[in-house]
Amino acid sequence: MTHITGTLYIISAPSGAGKTSLVKALMDAQQEPQHGAQAKIRVSVSHTTRAMRPGEVNGVNYNFVDRAEFVRMIEHGDFLEQAEVFGNLYGTSQSHLQQTLDEGHDLILEIDWQGARQVRAQMPQARSIFILPPTQQALRQRLTNRGQDSDEIIEARMREAVSEMSHYNEYEYVVVNDDFAGALEDLKAIFRANRLTQQHQQEQYSELFQELLA
């Protein structure tokens, strides 16, 4: 039986661009009956030292650990990548990521541009997607509408967003989240197209190809 290895997808975006909502909608869509056996996308659960927010579940949204535990994991070489964002540490478990790909699942890794660089250096075969807001004003409005942060923090997030967006040209694909439904279809199209590459089809239909060319 042919073994199919999953594909790693790096998805980055400034805070407020809608990355989390788009990824959730993508995951929800693959549960629809018409997707059938093709539904095999997973989302990587990162480790972080930041405080848990209302509604979040440990092990589902993030693996929440204290800074001492995070540093210990760095020293043990447990992370494929790690970064510090707004004073909080984030990291991706190397062993869990590889296990998921070896099981044939496509895996989404939601990380910033710094983490993306680290991952691409070690896994150049990974696909990369950057999500942009339609305008800076739209981004600011989305951050304000969250009602989670003070004006000072929103300004800091806007500065960070501009810095993050300046790295969009390091990614293979760019999705502009102006219309949510349209952006979701763009995201789905990237995943569908990648499954139709010659290499992926060769893995999935190797016996068929051998028969056709016999």
Swiss-Prot record:
Keyword hit for Cytoplasm: yes
Record-given protein name: Guanylate kinase
Record function comment: Essential for recycling GMP and indirectly, cGMP.
Chain residues that bind ATP: 13-20
Main location: cytoplasm
Natural source organism: Pseudomonas savastanoi pv. phaseolicola (strain 1448A / Race 6) (Pseudomonas syringae pv. phaseolicola (strain 1448A / Race 6))
Listed InterPro entries: GK/Ca_channel_bsu, Guanylate_kin-like_dom, Guanylate_kinase, Guanylate_kinase_CS, P-loop_NTPase
Taxonomy of the source species: Bacteria, Pseudomonadati, Pseudomonadota, Gammaproteobacteria, Pseudomonadales
EC number, as in UniProt: 2.7.4.8
EC category name: transferase
Family per similarity comment: Belongs to the guanylate kinase family.
GO cellular-component term (any): cytosol
Pfam families cross-referenced by the UniProt entry: Guanylate_kin
Compartmental location: Cytoplasm
Catalytic activity: GMP + ATP = GDP + ADP
GO terms for MF: ATP binding; guanylate kinase activity
